[in-house]
């Protein structure tokens, strides 16, 4: 069973396209869609519920209070683990898949490479900034390699409840980097060059808009890299140093701009 994990909040303009892109998948493995609706206040909940009523593979889990992206996603992981799904595919509520065989291609790779637990692909960009390109390595390396979360498929047994608890306690602004950094200590990562998804990158969805919010976000990311550097000695020190330099530059930019 492949669990498709969709975390969403106030994305009524995008969520239907995201769900439909999963439903169009042609795959020889059963698919179940878990939608973590983080107490949306727009039309997102109604759209998700309409899909869930029509297709029993869709579980619409609407939070009674807003939990934030990290806790919302971790709660989905806990539910997926309890249901015994073997694989987890990630899809943010504002992105969508473009290749109807996206899951099948990634699944085939994992089946034929038992030493690999995580696969991601190229992506098409839609938004304010171009998709960064560069050296993408089989072994996850945050100093060089990049991933786009909407392309990721990984083995569910990589998840550890104690690690999820630890990350949640830290209160980081993002989940993918610290979690996948821990994954990299026990499995290989693979990159497939064919684009399979569209990633929307714009300020209203992907990043804080005010200077104060951006400052806080950068500071929290710096704390995240420091945590990873301690958890995985030798693997992320370069990335931590780079985050420090970026933090200093951003401080002076906000101070004098």
Summary of predicted features, one role per range:
Residues 63-83, 105:
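Glycine-rich, basic loop-to-helix element that forms the pyrophosphate-binding segment
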Residues 20-30:
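Short, acidic, metal-binding catalytic loop of nucleotide-sugar glycosyltransferases
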Residues 1-3, 32, 178:
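Cell-envelope/extracellular polymer assembly enzymes that use nucleotide-activated donors
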Residues 10, 22, 38-39, 67:
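Conserved short acidic donor-positioning loop in nucleotide-sugar-dependent glycosyltransferases
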Residues 37-46, 65, 92:
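A conserved acidic beta->alpha catalytic loop
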Residues 100-131:
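Conserved donor NDP-sugar-binding/catalytic core segment of glycosyltransferases
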Residues 121, 132-216:
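Conserved nucleotide-sugar donor-binding catalytic segment
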């Amino acid at each position: 069973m492949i669990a498709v994990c969709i975390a969403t909040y106030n994305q009524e303009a995008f969520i239907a396209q995201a769900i439909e892109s999963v439903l169009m998948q042609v795959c020889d493995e059963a698919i179940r869609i878990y939608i973590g609706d983080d107490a949306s206040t727009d039309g997102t909940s109604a759209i998700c519920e309409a899909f869930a009523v029509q297709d029993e593979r869709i579980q619409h889990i609407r939070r009674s209070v807003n939990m934030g992206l990290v806790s919302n996603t971790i709660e989905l992981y806990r539910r997926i683990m309890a249901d015994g799904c073997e694989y987890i595919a990630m899809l943010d509520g504002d992105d969508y898949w473009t290749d109807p065989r996206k899951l099948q291609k990634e699944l085939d790779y994992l089946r034929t490479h038992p030493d690999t637990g995580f696969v991601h692909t190229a992506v098409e960009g839609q938004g304010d900034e171009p998709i960064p390109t560069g050296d993408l390595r089989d072994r996850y390396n945050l100093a060089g390699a990049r991933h786009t979360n909407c392309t990721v498929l990984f083995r569910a047994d990589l998840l550890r409840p104690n690690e999820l608890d630890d990350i949640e306690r830290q209160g980081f602004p993002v989940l993918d980097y610290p979690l996948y950094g821990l994954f990299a200590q026990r499995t290989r990562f693979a990159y497939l060059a064919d684009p399979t998804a569209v990633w929307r990158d714009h300020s209203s969805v992907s990043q804080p808009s005010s200077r104060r919010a951006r400052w806080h976000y950068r500071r929290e990311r710096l704390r995240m890299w420091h945590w990873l550097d301690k958890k995985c000695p030798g693997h992320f020190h370069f990335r931590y140093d780079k985050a420090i330099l970026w933090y200093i530059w951003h401080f002076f930019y906000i101070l004098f701009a």
